[in-house]
Regions:
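Active-site-flanking beta-strand signature of metal-NTP-handling nucleotidyl enzymes
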Residues: 3-10
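Short, surface-exposed ligand-recognition loops at beta-strand->loop->(often short) alpha-helix junctions
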Residues: 10-22
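Short hydrophobic/aromatic beta-strand micro-patches
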Residues: 11, 55-57
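Generic recognition of well-ordered alpha-helical segments
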Residues: 22-26, 78
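Short, glycine- and small/hydrophobic-rich beta-strand elements in well-ordered beta-sheets
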Residues: 28-53
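An amphipathic, aromatic/His-enriched active-site/gating alpha helix that lines ligand/cofactor pockets
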Residues: 32-39, 57-91
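Flexible, low-complexity linkers/stalks enriched in Thr/Pro that connect modular domains
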Residues: 43, 92-94
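A short acidic, often aromatic-flanked loop/helix-cap motif at beta-alpha or helix-coil junctions
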Residues: 96-98
């Protein structure tokens, strides 16, 4: 089953979430080369500029889980940590009709 992942990041000290964009672009450039990657979208909250939401789509949950364990992803994600006021929130959903 296709998998959608909502990734929410909130920057610290009122810092605009757009500071995360170079890191997100770098992560996506790596993700597009991973097995099972379908697409990704990035949203910046207009009412709360410190908040960013990424929606990532994968062909299977297993592909997403493999990506989460990728050492390069872990390193790039760690580069964003200095900007974050809270822990990155991941919510994984199945895509489709039952």
């Amino acid at each position: 089953m296709a998998t959608g992942v909502l990734i929410k990041r909130v920057t610290s000290h009122g810092e605009d979430a757009k500071v995360l964009l170079p890191h997100i672009v770098e992560l996506r450039a790596l993700a597009v080369r991973q097995p099972g990657y379908i697409s990704g979208e990035t949203f910046f909250n207009l009412d709360h500029p410190e908040e960013c939401l990424v929606i990532s789509r994968w062909t299977t949950l297993e592909h997403w889980q493999q990506w989460m364990q990728d050492p390069r992803r872990i390193e790039l994600d760690g580069n964003m940590e200095k900007h974050l006021g809270t822990k990155t929130e991941y919510n994984v959903y199945g895509i489709g009709l039952w």
